[in-house]
Amino acid sequence: LDRTWKPDIVHSHDWHAGLTAAYLAENPAHTAKSVFTIHNLAFRGLFPFGESDDLGFSRRMGFPHQFEFFGNFSFLKAGLVFSDKITTVSPTYAREVLTDAMGFGMQGVLKNRSKDFSGILNGLDYDIWNPKTDVQLVARYDSDDISGKAQCKKDLQKTFGLDENAKGPLFGVVSRLADQKGLDLVLATLGQILALDGQLVVLGSGEPTLEASFRHAAQTHKGHVACYIGYDEVLSHRLVAGSDALLVPSRFEPCGLTQIMALRYGTLPVARRTGGLA
């Protein structure tokens, strides 16, 4: 480490780095300003207070009150209290987390810091996510010539063992399989998808019950439903390009990127109006 280097700004992300700003504030010799970005307020970094004894914070820092969250020590709260500025990943989510319904108990802290708190929408690397130049695709296309998208759909169907069907809608999901993501709604509407002569491809992993449910659906409806439990970067590109619509039914979503990828690839995002999806 270069001990002579002094940063102007230290930018920390989520609860894992929540103590960074507190350590900067603890030592007046550190002149760097701090920014703390919340990606998901549901993860608060809670630990028993007995495990905080060796962290080295003094009473001068308001320890333990400034770190306390309903009897626990919260790394996230430390980031919210001590950072000079706070951001989150979309303007809508920034408004939502100030409410009792979406604040996960931190809404009071955020209201107290409202002058220093803002939402900045996530972006996408258009050099990587570009259907005109994407080397992961069997055919490339853009808004001037979308003929390659039909070839991508055919390739996706072949890759996942689906029936070749150019006319029926192909719905895609690229997601962590978790209750937050609302994917039980996809399972509940599977009959409607099949009634449209539609198909469903799921790429993701997460909660065992959802993994098992999508595996069962794929076994029951071979040729119409397929899933890949896990994550594969190449498959994610091919799925976004080959789908007609991408399903993003999240119950809450700080930002999300798949809907932005879908728009980039001419794939219709079907999303709940919440957070960064709104």
Where do the protein language model's features map onto the residues?
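Catalytic cores of nucleotide-sugar-dependent glycosyltransferases that transfer UDP/GDP/TDP-activated
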Residues: L1-A278
